[in-house]
UniProtKB/Swiss-Prot annotation:
The lineage of its organism: Eukaryota, Metazoa, Ecdysozoa, Arthropoda, Chelicerata. It holds the Pfam family Toxin_12. Expressed by the venom gland. Belongs to the neurotoxin 10 (Hwtx-1) family. 22 (Htx-4) subfamily. It comes from the Eukaryota. Residues 1-21 form the signal peptide. SUPFAM superfamilies: omega toxin-like. Residues 22-49 form a propeptide. It comes from Cyriopagopus hainanus (Chinese bird spider). It is found in: Secreted. The modification Isoleucine amide is found at I84. This is Mu-theraphotoxin-Hhn1d. InterPro entries: Huwentoxin-1, Huwentoxin_CS1. GO terms for molecular function: ion channel inhibitor activity; sodium channel regulator activity; toxin activity. Disulfide bonds join C51-C66, C58-C73, C65-C80.
Length: 86
């Protein structure tokens, strides 16, 4: 009786370890996949847009704000702001 209980508990412990290991592998795989997708997305954003976003510091003589997004470099405050009315 004691031996069968010991074997049953050992079997349950082994099952728990195997399930936990496979679950952690799945999580690691999904985390790696997600991070690789986000890394590719970040790289493509950097290649597409070489301009600054709203509220970023800029130099009025070399306007790096995105004209397509109606952003201009403020000469007074030296940061990218929306150009309203044009």
């Amino acid at each position: 009786m004691k031996a069968s209980m010991f074997l049953a508990l050992a079997g349950l412990a082994l099952l728990f370890v195997v399930c936990y290991a496979s679950e952690s592998e799945e999580k690691e795989f999904s985390n790696e996949l997600l991070s690789s997708v986000l890394a590719v997305d970040d790289n493509s954003k950097g290649e597409e847009r070489e301009c600054l976003g709203f509220g970023k510091g800029c130099n009025p003589s070399s306007d790096q704000c995105c004209k397509s997004s109606n952003l201009v470099c403020s000469r007074k405050h030296r940061w990218c702001k929306y150009e309203i009315g044009k």
